[in-house]
């Protein structure tokens, strides 16, 4: 769900300013729950950027390989088009690889778990594995 109500957006902006005035940073997270093409993801990021967060996090759905490839394309374009730091990946049956590839393509951060337990999100890699994969990929890029 994406908030488009002007009064709600104004309240979000006020809250973000308040957090900034206290010396903290704001991560604005949006999980639309649908597949989106590159242009839609970039448009969403630019729409969210107007609220002036420090980091924008977007998670879309990848139901198949085409959605996954579109997420890679979107990450490359996000890096070029959006000034604010962006963390973007896809969830769903085909989205797992975007959690590693998108940070390599310029995503701001990787969401991981320190160790798995009963409440862990199993789609997230453990921190040690993610670090090893990304560090080794960067060596060949």
Kindly label every feature range from the protein language model.
Residues 6-20, 36-40, 63-78, 96-97:
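Active-site-adjacent beta->alpha loops and helix N-cap segments on the catalytic face
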Residues 18-28, 49-55, 79-83, 103-111:
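Glycine-enriched alpha-helix->loop->beta-strand junction motifs that scaffold or abut catalytic
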Residues 76-141:
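C-terminal alpha-helical cap/extension of soluble enzyme domains
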